Amino acid sequence: MTNAQLFLNNSWADKSETMSGSGSTLANTKAVREHLPLLLEKYNIESMFDAPCGDGNWIQHVDLTCAYTGGDLVQKFVDANPLQSVVFDITLGTFPAVDLWMCRACLYHLSNVEIQLAIDNFKQSNIKYALITSHTGNSGGDIRTGSFRVLNLEEHNYFGLDAPIDQIPDVLFNNMQENLLLFVNPRITK
């Protein structure tokens, strides 16, 4: 089964509001919707690539001050997204030329091998920043793609990322805080 098929068969989705899962409801994205525009302004972000973007349920309600493109494995999500989006695989695709890659609520559903592929793909791109979801708890072990585990990207220098330079709060889910950590691409100098 391909990753697209795994995520298309999303039994976890909150189908009353979004096909992208309960983490993409307006209630669960309140903090990120408030803090994301401030971060974009602080770092002079003029363009962003949101991958995976899901169906765009929450991002369409953000006051974006930059050019936006979404990318997702699932054609159905891309078609449903009211903002510009394309079919894209973060582990294989060539990232577009943008200032920021936002990877929200994704990596903790991927195996360690696929996470490393996505991070390496980012590091080989010309994107300056990556904004990636991380938990505050202790990381769980490796999983099969499509499952879930706690993933703390600040723990044990996971996947060769340098320490994050900033963060914004995301959602408190099952008594566990999720934040979006801002990383600088080591290939790009300031």
Regions inferred by a protein language model and the residue ranges of each:
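Class I (Rossmann-like) S-adenosyl-L-methionine-dependent methyltransferase catalytic domain
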Residues: 1-97, 110-190
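A conserved beta-strand element that flanks and buttresses the S-adenosyl-L-methionine
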Residues: 102
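Hydrophobic adenine-recognition pocket in adenosine-nucleotide-binding enzymes
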Residues: 106
